[in-house]
UniProtKB/Swiss-Prot annotation:
It is an enzyme of class 1 (oxidoreductase). Pathway: Amino-acid biosynthesis; L-isoleucine biosynthesis; L-isoleucine from 2-oxobutanoate: step 2/4; Amino-acid biosynthesis; L-valine biosynthesis; L-valine from pyruvate: step 2/4. Residues 307-455, 456-592 form the KARI C-terminal knotted domain. SUPFAM superfamilies: 6-phosphogluconate dehydrogenase C-terminal domain-like (SSF48179), NAD(P)-binding Rossmann-fold domains (SSF51735). It comes from the Eukaryota. This is Ketol-acid reductoisomerase, chloroplastic. It comes from Spinacia oleracea (Spinach). Residues 108-306 form the KARI N-terminal Rossmann domain. Keywords: Amino-acid biosynthesis, Branched-chain amino acid biosynthesis, Chloroplast, Magnesium, Metal-binding, NADP, Oxidoreductase, Plastid, Transit peptide.
């Protein structure tokens, strides 16, 4: 394939880059012409909008207020971030332009037919060091090894672990060994690798990054699957060494999903988990092709561009929101409501967890949120609207706070400190993460699943659908207002939820979903799930019980939101097979496997 011009990106200028990479970066904003979901008017936004919490005073009350009283007001003096086009060039892979609700973006479509191009993408790389063995590392290492073998490449994939790590046995069982040079000490592996994939936990990265940098060869490439380390460095006023390239490939799903869909798709071209990629520093012009090669080798159906900063903000936020924390809060809240209203426990579980992880997820994945709404009866639509109207702003209240905690570095600091509390220190005991599926609700779930017919997607309960979709749409709006691209918004708010994560809760409950994820995700889900549970119980459900009128503007804007068109385009790029997750799955974390 003929080489193109020097690699360029049209990315946000907020990311720090090396001098070499800075020359290749250019910002390419595209004027926004979207109805952003709050007020239904013309598609051209003539006045920017902002949130205002208006105080609603009940008769006889002296004051009060809540997220329910939030409303949109005209604020022409405030600049709304214009949409940014993420463009790039590759000398190896073909990019495609997709239009998402009026915004042009560029992707690389994956597939096993592209594996023969991997040797060109990894030119100059003799060893890929995969450091760690948590959620992502086992999946990525095995996928890389299998893809490179199929491509007849002589690039070595080597696992690097701490001396004495219990994960050595797991890595050996997956086909890596000291004898053939594919398994060893992490520091020796880092020193000997041309591409270092740092897939240890985020808190471990924060505590060990200086030693990692010191062991890397000049002109080698640091690969990340999360922008967390950049956020940590920014909080300290530090940056990456200038003599290495820094890239990221971030699968939009937990590690077990990355491996499972790759294996399922061996007979079907194009199965895997979508990924974003970023080039933060490029010291020799190879970074883009290496990043895209990495993503293709993982089996990503499509790969879209972002920045490390945009990635960590959307990812850390998303997993605390609809992906993990918020959905946990929703089902706990609604299970209590339904049982307290006289519904049987079995039916309440079906109308919450089974409903969301089954028919709701399946419909959104293949047809979108509008199709879900339109499948309801007229009475069902009324219940959906009541739940949606009451839940949207309370959900946005917590989501807004969460995003700002992530963007400010507060949530990153919380993760680092939590990781240090896993061990005894300062005379205080260790506090590892506890279990999250031991309450009555999740025991009921075990019983429901034990008699569930194969392939049963559960009932479609309109009220549950209204709450879930309201939170999903509120998350989309936060990310949209914060300037994220549609491909990132949809993957972090919709696709990852319904195609990667919810199937695990459907198979074996909330812990099976949450605890197969990264440490950062597991911590965030535990921290924020109770916040969503609380605000929905205290504000949304109370409003419904008090007969609060349905906000017809919210419903109208949901029905006409441009995100539906963008989701429709992305649905055409979904994996070629649906993930198959069973309760006895052997591709999950060892501690979560059934005996």
């Amino acid at each position: 394939m003929a080489a193109t011009a020097a690699t360029t990106f049209s990315l946000s200028s907020s990311s720090s880059t090396s001098a070499a990479a800075s020359k290749a970066l250019k910002q390419s904003p595209k004027p926004s012409a979207l109805n952003l979901g709050f007020l239904g008017s013309s598609s051209t936004i003539k006045a920017c909008r902002s949130l205002k919490a208006a105080r609603v005073l009940p008769s006889g009350a002296n004051g009060g207020g809540s997220a329910l009283s939030a409303q949109m007001v005209s604020a022409p003096s405030i600049n709304t971030p214009s949409a940014t086009t993420f463009d790039f060039d590759s000398s190896v892979f073909k990019k495609e332009k997709v239009t998402l609700s009026g915004h042009d973006e560029y992707i690389v479509r994956g597939g096993r037919n592209l594996f023969p191009l991997l040797p060109d993408a990894f030119k100059g790389i003799k060893q890929i060091g995969v450091i760690g063995w948590g959620s992502q590392a086992p999946a990525q290492a095995q996928n890389l090894k299998d893809s490179l073998t199929e491509a007849k490449s002589d690039v070595v994939v080597k696992i690097g672990l701490r001396k004495g790590s219990n994960s050595f046995a797991e890595a050996r069982a997956a086909g890596f060994s000291e004898e053939n040079g594919t398994l060893g000490d992490m520091w020796e592996t880092i020193s000997g690798s041309d591409l270092v994939l740092l897939l240890i936990s985020d808190s471990a990265q924060a505590d060990n990054y200086e030693k990692v940098f010191s062991h890397m060869k000049p002109n080698s490439i640091l690969g990340l699957s999360h922008g967390f380390l950049l956020g940590h460095l920014q909080s300290l006023g530090q940056d990456f060494p200038k003599n290495i390239s820094v890239i990221a490939v971030c699968p939009k799903g937990m590690g077990p999903s990355v491996r499972r869909l790759y294996v399922q798709g061996k007979e079907v071209n194009g199965a895997g988990i979508n990924s974003s990629f970023a080039v933060h520093q490029d010291v020799d012009g190879r970074a883009t092709d290496v990043a895209l090669g990495w993503s293709i080798a993982l089996g990503s159906p499509f790969t879209f561009a972002t920045t490390l900063e945009q990635e960590y903000k959307s990812d850390i936020f998303g997993e605390r929101g609809i992906l993990l924390g918020a959905v946990h809060g929703i089902v706990e809240c609604l299970f209590r409501r339904y049982t307290e209203s006289g519904m049987s426990e079995d039916l309440a579980y079906k109308n919450t967890v089974e409903c969301i992880t089954g028919v709701i997820s399946k419909t959104i994945s293949t047809k979108g949120m509008l199709a879900l709404y339109n499948s309801l009866s007229e009475e069902g639509k009324k219940d959906f609207q009541a739940a949606y109207s009451a839940s949207y702003y309370p959900s946005m209240d917590i989501l807004y706070e969460c995003y700002e905690d992530v963007a400010s570095g507060s949530e990153i600091r919380s993760v680092v400190l939590a990781g240090r509390r896993f061990y005894e220190k300062e005379g205080l005991p260790a506090f590892p993460m506890g279990k999250i599926d031991q309450t009555r609700m999740w025991k009921v779930g075990e019983k429901v699943r034990s008699v569930r017919p194969a392939g049963d997607l559960g009932p479609l309960y309109p009220f549950t659908a209204g709450v879930y979709v309201a939170l999903m749409m509120a998350q989309i709006e936060i990310l949209r207002k914060k300037g994220h691209s549609y491909s990132e918004i949809i993957n972090e708010s919709v696709i990852e939820a319904v195609d990667s994560l919810n199937p695990f809760m459907h198979a074996r409950g909330v812990s099976f979903m949450v605890d197969n994820c990264s440490t950062t995700a597991r911590l965030g889900s535990r921290k924020w799930a109770p916040r969503f549970d609380y605000i929905l119980s205290q504000q949304a459900l109370v409003a419904v019980d008090n007969g609060a009128p349905i906000n017809q503007d919210l419903i109208s804007n949901f029905l006409s939101d441009p995100v539906h068109e963008a989701i429709g385009v992305c649905a055409q790029l979904r994996p070629s097979v649906d993930i198959s997750v069973t309760a006895d799955a052997d591709f999950v974390r060892p501690e979560l496997r059934q005996a």
